[in-house]
Design a protein with these regions (language model features):
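Catalytic alpha-helical scaffold of carbohydrate-active enzymes acting on polysaccharides/glycoconjugates
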Residues: 2-203, 222-297
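Surface-exposed cleft-lining segments at the edges of enzyme active sites
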Residues: 207-217
């Protein structure tokens, strides 16, 4: 597989024996009106005017985790830390990792290098001030790293981040790098660890295997089979991701969106919570820092 120059691999990450078959459980903490698909309808300076459902939905996520006895990583917007610090503190109090999702869910390729630096530094500082813990990980809004952002990993490292999970090696109309490495690797010249979202190679294509709308769309048995296939054949952790709003079928409905956007956002929301609860019981899950960094620090 040909790697893009800006994603030159220094070396692959190798799972320590202690990692076993533990998979990475990740949650991107943003609300239903903050997703990239709705940004043409909802100005960021109007976010406080919308009904925010983050507290109740994060509570539901944490309750599911507690019932299953699992811990995970939460990529949290700095905006959430500013407006709902008690939510962030509960996440930490229950033993989960807090990582950064930027300040206001602005895609990296829509920022200049200086603006990106300011954004991720501010978000990290806010999250550390709220939690009293070092923030080590970052995830870009909407997987927004590509050839337009060759400076991004270097800036992340300079800002103090130790890993990124910002690349999805799939073909998609809004994001995705199908030719990117589909394994965790250290980025050459930056030194930071990049942990792509999980895909499964079938019929010459990378299929999205672990999270988001794909998990809602595919039958649970198929999703579970794809994840187990990754773990079994490639001997690496699965990186699963979702959002708190996906547990909320009663969320307010957006108007003025295309049929495709409506389908992608709302399909099978009512089935997501029981599916997630089952998945948490069926596979072994953990925090990204403990899996990939050994929680050293």
């Amino acid at each position: 597989m040909e790697n893009k120059t800006f994603l030159a691999v220094d070396r692959r990450w190798s799972p320590p024996a202690a990692a076993g078959r533990t998979n990475a459980l990740t949650c991107d903490v943003e609300d239903y009106f903050q997703v990239s698909a709705f940004e043409h309808l909802v100005r960021r300076d109007s976010w406080k005017e919308w009904e925010c459902r983050i507290p109740r939905n994060v509570d539901r996520v944490l309750d599911l985790y507690d019932q299953a006895g699992v811990r995970g990583t939460f990529f949290i917007l700095g905006w959430v830390a500013e407006n709902f610090p008690e939510v962030v503190r509960r996440i930490v109090a229950e033993g989960h990792e807090v990582a950064s999702h930027g300040m206001q869910h602005v895609r990296v390729w829509d920022q200049t290098p200086d603006a990106f630096r300011a954004d991720i530094v501010r978000a990290r500082t806010l999250l550390q001030d709220v939690t009293g813990q070092r923030v080590r990980g970052y995830r870009a809004a909407s997987w927004s790293l590509d050839e337009r952002t060759p400076w991004a990993h270097r800036i992340m490292a300079e800002a103090g981040y130790e890993y990124s999970s910002s690349i999805y090696p799939i073909a998609h109309d809004h994001y995705g790098l199908p030719d990117a490495p589909d394994f965790p690797f250290y980025v050459k010249s930056a030194g930071i660890l990049e942990i792509p979202a999980s895909t499964s190679r079938l019929l010459g294509r990378n299929l999205p295997a672990a999270g988001g709308g794909y998990f809602r769309l595919m039958p649970l048995a198929v999703s579970r089979w794809l994840m187990q296939r990754i773990s079994r054949t490639r001997e690496m952790p699965v990186v699963f991701y979702f959002h708190p709003w996906e547990l909320d079928p009663e969320q307010p409905r957006m108007t003025g969106i295309t049929a495709r956007t409506r389908f992608r956002h709302y399909v099978n929301l009512q089935r997501f919570e029981p599916r997630l609860a089952r998945l948490l019981r069926d596979l072994k899950w953990g925090r990204m820092d403990e899996i990939y960094l050994g929680n050293s620090g």
